[in-house]
Amino acid sequence: MKRDPDEERINVRDADCIRARRPLLVAHRGGVIAANAPENSLGAIRLAAVHGYDMVELDVREAKDGVPVLFHGSSGRGLWMDCGVPHFLEELTAEELVALRYRASTEHIATLAQALALCASLGLGVMLDIKSGALSEGYLGRIADLLREHDCGSSTVTIATDAEIRPALADQVLFPVSKEDEARACEGEAVSLEGQFWFGWAAELPNATVAALQRNGAFSIVSINTFHYPAHAWQSLARQDIRRLMAAGVEGFQIDSVYGDCFGIV
């Protein structure tokens, strides 16, 4: 296990805390995926805590009645692949959705409220992936209210970059460094990047960029996901990337749980 379960929840606004946790580990797709722990389920979140992750990535979508719920799903297939229901998520209310069970599992679709309450109780930080859509002011306001209710303001980042999200969640989450500011930092310009983080694929982050970001106050979280690599080499190429980026000083990794052993998680 990497993280002591009694350790305090990560403070993403504290540079010393980030460095002390290195490598900071974020469980992709809502936690550790296992036989009875589908992605974005409460069971997967619990397993992330058991296995010592610092944070979980939560995929957030809007139900028909405006309630934020957790779901990733297969592109264009709605709820059929995961829950065996011939509907799209946005066609059902939150009450209808949480009544649905994932196929071959006892786990149900969860609301963001349920997930944040569980993360708070387990000492897990949160990476929000707010899936694009209409993103109404009311919907984003509900997300902000839930983050406040569960005291997530110092332990949450988002990888969503839609223009509507920043003003709605500005006091509750950290946002990614913009491509423009990244370029300026890499060109040697002094750019204030404190309170921001870099997020992206390993192939997008040269070692020199890691150093440039750190000089200007930002930290990095690199995604290591199986779909980033060819099917015949998803293990070997990922391990190469992890070794390189660890040596370069990268602070965090968002990983599929199959890569846990690369960080001493079994």
Report the location of each language-model feature.
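Phosphate-group recognition and catalysis centered on beta-loop-alpha active-site segments
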Residues: 1-266
